Amino acid sequence: MHLKLPLSILAAVILGAGSTLAQDLTGTLKKIKDTGTITLGHRETSVPFSYYDDKQQIVGYAMDLCYLIEDAVKSELKLPKLEVKLNPVTSATRIPLIANGTVDLECGSTTNNLERQKQVSFTITHFVTSNRFMSKKAAHLNTVEDLRGKTIVSLSGTTNIKQIIEINAQKGLNLNILAAKEHAEGFLMVETGRAAAFVMDDILLYSLVAGSKSPQDYVISADALSVEPYGIMLRRDDAPFKKVVDQVMIETYRSGAINAIYDKWFLKPIPPKGINLNVPMSAAFKKVIASPTDSGDPAVY
């Protein structure tokens, strides 16, 4: 059972979103009403978005947002009880599991882009990051050009690995590109010398470095390969459910509730090691809060 968010936050969101929720039930809303269950897809090591803590509970910034959505849906569907099923997903399985109906919401660190919107839908952007690479300081890898001829790792099924494959072809870098399944695995490859660099979203790299045995040994590139807006995934062509989810997100921003949730995960100590990531809210995300968008176009951010 998940920990409830503060009642003041829940009340603001539910009251604000209530007028638009659950009218003619179809698609996912009907499924939730009929089964009394909502299935949330989660990651295992996407700190601080969706991951296992030291008690083997799934926690994180994206999970808190998904629980807000779950609480609002439960209230508006007037369900005495709404069972939450947690289904693990990886970078490779998350889109298929949304598309085939196994998972209702994917609560993680997934980039919303125009290509993915052909398969799934996204709610309002909840974080904006950039694609960079992490390496050992001793290797002196500062730019993409410095990676020439090296073995690098990224995650299968991500925009990150697609981008580095494209850059490798464009620049003729002669990279040996390995595909890991999870973030912790990618970091371990650099830590143990199997790869010279790990290409991934910078916020995830900062989290991995901060939680490592020797954070002072690693550096994250100044070079940014792209802008990556994160969104909670849901099925395409399900306008009633998307309307519900979007309204919850919009009200979370409008009410200011997002500030407490953001601070909890990015500006305060987080489990399992009590590390403070100390990542202030970016100008790009503040812009989203002021003018909520679900755009998959990086230029919007």
What name fits each language-model region?
Residues 67, 78-146, 286-299:
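Acidic, polar ligand-binding/catalytic clefts
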Residues 23, 33, 159-178, 216-218, ...:
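Ligand-binding clefts/hinges and TM-proximal coupling segments of bilobed small-molecule sensing domains
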Residues 93, 107-118, 162-170, 188-226, ...:
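A ligand-binding cleft/hinge motif common to bilobed small-molecule-binding domains
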Residues 39-48, 58-75, 111, 129-183, ...:
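Bilobed "Venus flytrap"/periplasmic-binding protein-like clamshell domains
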Residues 23, 29, 67-72, 145, ...:
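Extended ligand-binding regions for polar small-molecule ligands
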Residues 23-105, 255:
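Extracytoplasmic small-molecule ligand-binding "clamshell" domains
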Residues 25-26, 79-96, 139, 177-189, ...:
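Short helix-initiation/N-cap motifs at beta->coil->alpha
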Residues 44, 127-138, 202, 210-249, ...:
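Periplasmic-binding protein-like
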